[in-house]
């Protein structure tokens, strides 16, 4: 959640940064109006409280001097003040609650070094790694390869569920499992502790990482239950520490988990309708880190390097992109995307996003750490290492042969 104290103190500059992420100016003006009302009420309230305290002391003095009549008169004034104070306190609480609700749907402030831009077309390429493969034949898309090899059964996926669900068979199923184990082992080598988490979480957990209340339409909710299927392991991993004070954070907490992920993909109608690039259910191995504020930049670089190294081990060509302000996610202050080469599309496609949310999620989820005698907000980071289904797509397309078979990357052979 955005720091409301910072927004109130430096409204013009902060709102200017927020507009770069597409925040509606009317919403910001409503918040500004509430800040003004809050300030006016607090000023009046402070005066009334001061007046009440002065009168209360006078009552004590009159009672000591035996002047009960005068004391009773002032008591009436104090009681009248109490009623005014009670009304104002209720108004103040209403305004503060309203500010809190509005803050829950305001995104994080982008870092100063994030490039300014409206959408993905203005993201900035950092570097490319690996050679794009050349074929002496027309490379086939993964869905065509998958059906020919009887690896991917789209028809039965629809029969069992609906569109954007797929049945994986034979070597596709084995490769999916191999990739999960490979990614978990790889992340552990980079110092991330493996965790197994619930695939369903409650509303407070979804709110803690920023999925609720703004993105409810993209979540699968369990009917008659306050439970949601997770869209990413970032949600349960980060919220492990919700409402907690971490006593020792001298070293960052580094976690990794495999989970299936569930997304309605609202707003994706007509995009990636073929194959398994965009599914309602997909596997992902996630990285999450919790750090002191001064350690989060270093951890961000480490997480980008970890995910990048996984692609390099698999021999997959990729590029790194710094996302511009208009393409940043809701909770992110800064994001680097990794995009892997997809031959049939003749372009790079996202396979990982690594984000530093600074103290945005920590403020929502109340995750703090001990710094001497003070409790301070942590920084939280997350990133895919990696999206399993999209890695399978990249392997199928980059490692395909002229006869329609798929070669296996050396790094995966021991897992098969």
UniProtKB/Swiss-Prot annotation:
It is found in: Cytoplasm. It comes from the Bacteria. The keyword 4Fe-4S does not apply. It is an enzyme of class 6 (ligase). One of its GO terms (molecular function) is serine-tRNA ligase activity. Its EC number is 6.1.1.11. Keywords: Aminoacyl-tRNA synthetase, ATP-binding, Cytoplasm, Ligase, Nucleotide-binding, Protein biosynthesis. SUPFAM superfamilies: Class II aaRS and biotin synthetases, tRNA-binding arm. GO terms for biological process: selenocysteine biosynthetic process; seryl-tRNA aminoacylation. L-serine binds at residues 232-234, 286, 384. One of its GO terms (cellular component) is cytoplasm. It catalyses: tRNA(Ser) + L-serine + ATP = L-seryl-tRNA(Ser) + AMP + diphosphate + H(+); tRNA(Sec) + L-serine + ATP = L-seryl-tRNA(Sec) + AMP + diphosphate + H(+). CDD domains: SerRS_core (cd00770). The keyword DNA repair does not apply. NCBIfam families: serS. Consists of two distinct domains, a catalytic core and a N-terminal extension that is involved in tRNA binding. Belongs to the class-II aminoacyl-tRNA synthetase family. Type-1 seryl-tRNA synthetase subfamily. Catalyzes the attachment of serine to tRNA(Ser). Is also able to aminoacylate tRNA(Sec) with serine, to form the misacylated tRNA L-seryl-tRNA(Sec), which will be further converted into selenocysteinyl-tRNA(Sec). This is Serine--tRNA ligase.
